[in-house]
């Protein structure tokens, strides 16, 4: 079980309250697909992903990005039970979608970049440390079914 300090919880929940889930989620997923183009193979049903412009303008990328970041909200709400919170998603991504679990870490790193870009003043080194811990814990929980 992961131990969260009161300060970490405050930094995570405080920033999360300011996040526009639709915009940040869309940006995070689009960045993942652009920066790590091999991840596009998991999104073949999304249509045109042929260029950064196409990816950024793709409504399915935007919708799924919102869905992904909404699930991060579940982690924020359940900091003391992230493993169980993501048990079904781990099973889905492992057994049905066959997603490389390394992609969860990559998405977490991308999310950190998006948050830093959107919240320059609030995203202090202490805030980043708390969020790095969160994305690492979420990635581990999503990869759990693979072990």
Curated annotation (Swiss-Prot):
<dbReference type="InterPro" id="IPR000971">
    <property type="entry name" value="Globin"/>
</dbReference>
<dbReference type="GO" id="GO:0072562">
    <property type="term" value="C:blood microparticle"/>
</dbReference>
<dbReference type="GO" id="GO:0005344">
    <property type="term" value="F:oxygen carrier activity"/>
</dbReference>
<dbReference type="GO" id="GO:0005833">
    <property type="term" value="C:hemoglobin complex"/>
</dbReference>
<comment type="function">
    <text>Involved in oxygen transport from the lung to the various peripheral tissues.</text>
</comment>
<dbReference type="GO" id="GO:0042744">
    <property type="term" value="P:hydrogen peroxide catabolic process"/>
</dbReference>
<dbReference type="GO" id="GO:0004601">
    <property type="term" value="F:peroxidase activity"/>
</dbReference>
<protein>
    <recommendedName>
        <fullName>Hemoglobin subunit beta</fullName>
    </recommendedName>
</protein>
<dbReference type="Pfam" id="PF00042">
    <property type="entry name" value="Globin"/>
</dbReference>
<keyword id="KW-0408">Iron</keyword>
<feature type="binding site" description="distal binding residue">
    <location>
        <position position="64"/>
    </location>
    <ligand>
        <name>heme b</name>
    </ligand>
</feature>
<comment type="subunit">
    <text>Heterotetramer of two alpha chains and two beta chains.</text>
</comment>
<feature type="binding site" description="proximal binding residue">
    <location>
        <position position="93"/>
    </location>
    <ligand>
        <name>heme b</name>
    </ligand>
</feature>
<dbReference type="InterPro" id="IPR009050">
    <property type="entry name" value="Globin-like_sf"/>
</dbReference>
<dbReference type="InterPro" id="IPR012292">
    <property type="entry name" value="Globin/Proto"/>
</dbReference>
<dbReference type="GO" id="GO:0020037">
    <property type="term" value="F:heme binding"/>
</dbReference>
<keyword id="KW-0349">Heme</keyword>
<keyword id="KW-0561">Oxygen transport</keyword>
<comment type="similarity">
    <text>Belongs to the globin family.</text>
</comment>
<dbReference type="InterPro" id="IPR002337">
    <property type="entry name" value="Hemoglobin_b"/>
</dbReference>
<keyword id="KW-0813">Transport</keyword>
<keyword id="KW-0479">Metal-binding</keyword>
<dbReference type="GO" id="GO:0046872">
    <property type="term" value="F:metal ion binding"/>
</dbReference>
<dbReference type="GO" id="GO:0031720">
    <property type="term" value="F:haptoglobin binding"/>
</dbReference>
<dbReference type="GO" id="GO:0031838">
    <property type="term" value="C:haptoglobin-hemoglobin complex"/>
</dbReference>
<feature type="domain" description="Globin">
    <location>
        <begin position="3"/>
        <end position="147"/>
    </location>
</feature>
<dbReference type="GO" id="GO:0019825">
    <property type="term" value="F:oxygen binding"/>
</dbReference>
<dbReference type="InterPro" id="IPR050056">
    <property type="entry name" value="Hemoglobin_oxygen_transport"/>
</dbReference>
<dbReference type="GO" id="GO:0043177">
    <property type="term" value="F:organic acid binding"/>
</dbReference>
């Amino acid at each position: 079980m992961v131990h969260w300090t009161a300060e970490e919880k405050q930094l995570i929940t405080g920033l999360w309250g300011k996040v526009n889930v639709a915009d940040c989620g869309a940006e995070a997923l689009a960045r993942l697909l652009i920066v790590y183009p091999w991840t596009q193979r998991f999104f073949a049903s999304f249509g045109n992903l042929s260029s950064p412009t196409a990816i950024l303008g793709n409504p399915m990328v935007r919708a799924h990005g919102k869905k992904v970041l909404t699930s991060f909200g579940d982690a924020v709400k359940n900091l003391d039970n992230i493993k169980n919170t993501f048990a079904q998603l781990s099973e889905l991504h492992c057994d049905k979608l066959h997603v490389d679990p390394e992609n969860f870490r990559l998405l977490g790193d991308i999310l950190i970049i998006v948050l830093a870009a959107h919240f320059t003043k609030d995203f202090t080194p202490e805030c980043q440390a708390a969020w790095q811990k969160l994305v690492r814990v979420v990635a581990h929980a999503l990869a759990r079914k693979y072990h």
